[in-house]
Amino acid sequence: MLKNQIDIQLSTKRKEKPSFSDLKFGKTYTDHMFIMDYSREKGWHDPRIVPYQPITLDPAATIFHYGQTIFEGLKAYVSENEEVFLFRPDENIKRQNRSSVRMCIPEVDEDLALEALKKLVSIDRDWIPNQEGMSLYIRPFIISTEPNLDVTPSQTYKFMIIMSPVGSFYKEGMNPVKIAVENEYVRAVRGGTGNAKTAGNYAGAMIVQEIASAEGYSQVLWLDGKENKYIEEVGSMNVFFKINGEVVTPALSGSILEGITRKSVIELLKHWGVPVSERRISIDELHVAYQKGQLEEAFGSGTAAVISPIGELSWKNEKMVINNGETGELSLKVYKALTGIQTGKEEDPFGWRVKVE
C-alpha cells in the first residue's frame, strides 16, 4: 500500500486546549485520529485521518467477548527550536506486529504505520506540550470488529491511533516510588501472552494494583508464574537493579514485555561502559543483596514514565528502603540522557530520534 493513499479529512471545529500545566494522564485527546479497516477480502484498506470521533460497533463484535486486541504506546516531543520528534517509532511498530501475530491479528505494513504516525502528529503538532517533562502520548491499537460469538479469530478489524497531551505518569514524577512485591497473583506465565501488549494482561493486573494503591504503593513488583520467586516486571514497566556496581534486569523469558525503553536503557549503559546483565534474578537474591548493603539503586523503565526510581520495596513483612529512599545517581543520569535525546537537547549517537516534518 502506498503511503500517499492516506486520506486526510481535517476537523472544521477545533477543540479548546486544556491548560498544559494541569494535565491528567490520558484524559484529553487531540483534534484528529487515524483509522484503517481490515477484511479478509481486501486486507488492510482505506487508511484515513479524520476528526476525533466515536466509533460504532455491533454488540456481538468479538472485541467485547474474547478480547482480541493489541495496543502500543509512544510519545512525540517538541524541542526548544520547535522541532517535533518521535522516539524509536519503528520499534513500536515492530512490537505491534509481534503482538498481532500472538493474538491472531493481521500485521500492518510497517512503512504505512510509520507514515500514519508522522502525518497524524504533524497535523496535531500544536497539541504537544513544550513544558519540561511533558509530551504527546500516542496510542495505536487494533480491535476485532466482526459480529460473531463463535470463539474464532475475527475476519474484520480496525487499526486506530489516538493521541493525548500528558504530564508525568506518576504523581511522584522523578521522586522515588514505593512498590509492593506481589506474592499471590501473577501477571503472566511462559507460553502465555505476557510478551504481547494486549488488553487482558492489564485488566488482570488491576485488582492487584487497586489493593496496592489502597495500601499506599504506586505499583507492584511481579514475580514469575511458575515458581513465584523470579522477578519479572514492576507494574507496567520493566525493572532494573544496581547491585554491587552491576546493573541487572530480568532476562526476556516470554512472559515479560520487550520494552523499548528497556532496550534503550541497556544500550545506553553499554555505551557508557556500565556493567549490565540480562538474567534471572530472584526476590531472595535481591533481598540478600539488600541485607549486605549491595542493593544500590532500583528503577522502572517504560514509555509512560520513562524512568521511575524505586525508593522502597515491600516484601512479606519487610520494607527494603533503597538508597535512603532517594533518587539514585544512575537513575537520574539515565533519565536525563533519554529525555535529552527525546527532546533534542542532547546528541543522538544511536539514531533513535525521528523528526516529524
Question: PLM features: what roles do these ranges have?
Answer:
Residues L2-K3, D22, P89-N92, N97, ...:
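Extended Lys/Arg-rich, glycine-bearing segments that form polyanion-binding/interaction patches
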Residues L2-F20, T28, K171, I179, ...:
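Conserved catalytic-core subdomain
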Residues D109-D111, W127-S135, V220-L223, G273-I283, ...:
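Flexible, glycine/charged-enriched surface loops at secondary-structure junctions
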Residues D58-K75, A304-S308:
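Conserved phosphate/anionic-ligand binding catalytic regions in large, soluble enzymes, centered on
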Residues L2-D58:
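Intrinsically disordered, low-complexity, positively charged segments
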Residues K27-I35, I49, T62, P176-L223, ...:
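Active-site-adjacent loop/helix segments that line or gate small-molecule/cofactor pockets in enzymes
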Residues I35-W44, I70, Y77-E82, P89, ...:
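Short acidic-glycine loop/turn motifs at beta-strand connectors
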